[in-house]
């Protein structure tokens, strides 16, 4: 078990621009906010926000995770965000909307989901 030591001091740097990487899978949504060089400033996920099981894959869980990551990024002084969205999950748009609602100026949204140019054979279709 991790012990609760002294609180982490967040040094307010002169970082005004950042990148929000949103990885939205079918099971979870992970949000990482970095500076322009790619150094992670804050992160949150639906699972780390207290959602378990099928509730992790909901848009509301992605919204809560984005609010947590955005609140920490605000302490660093970030105002403008580029958003890079990866994956087909249900939390894609709600995470972007909640970052916008926190007061970040979203400069652009880029979909970086990898698409094969007829590469590997996909897994077989599910029969439910």
From Swiss-Prot:
Cellular component, GO annotation: ribonucleoprotein complex; ribosome
Keyword Ribosomal protein listed: yes
GO MF terms held by the record: rRNA binding; structural constituent of ribosome
SUPFAM superfamilies the record matches: Translational machinery components
UniProt keyword list: Ribonucleoprotein, Ribosomal protein, RNA-binding, rRNA-binding
Gene Ontology biological process: translation
Purpose: Located on the platform of the 30S subunit, it bridges several disparate RNA helices of the 16S rRNA. Forms part of the Shine-Dalgarno cleft in the 70S ribosome.
Homology family: Belongs to the universal ribosomal protein uS11 family.
Subunit structure: Part of the 30S ribosomal subunit. Interacts with proteins S7 and S18. Binds to IF-3.
HAMAP family: Ribosomal_uS11 (MF_01310)
Protein name: Small ribosomal subunit protein uS11
Organism the protein comes from: Methylococcus capsulatus (strain ATCC 33009 / NCIMB 11132 / Bath)
Biological classification of the source: Bacteria, Pseudomonadati, Pseudomonadota, Gammaproteobacteria, Methylococcales
Gene responsible for this protein: rpsK
């Amino acid at each position: 078990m991790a012990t609760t030591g002294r609180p982490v001091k967040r040094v307010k740097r002169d970082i005004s621009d950042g990148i929000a990487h949103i990885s939205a899978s079918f099971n979870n949504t992970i949000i990482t906010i970095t500076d322009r060089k790619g150094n992670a400033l804050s992160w949150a996920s639906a699972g780390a926000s207290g959602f378990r099981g099928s509730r992790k894959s909901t848009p509301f869980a992605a919204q809560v995770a984005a609010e947590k990551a955005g609140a920490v990024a605000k302490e660093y002084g970030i105002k403008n965000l580029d958003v890079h969205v990866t994956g087909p999950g249900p939390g894609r748009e709600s995470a972007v909307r909640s970052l916008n609602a926190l007061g970040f100026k979203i400069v652009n949204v880029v979909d970086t989901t990898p698409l094969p140019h007829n590469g590997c054979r996909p897994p077989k279709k599910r029969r439910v």
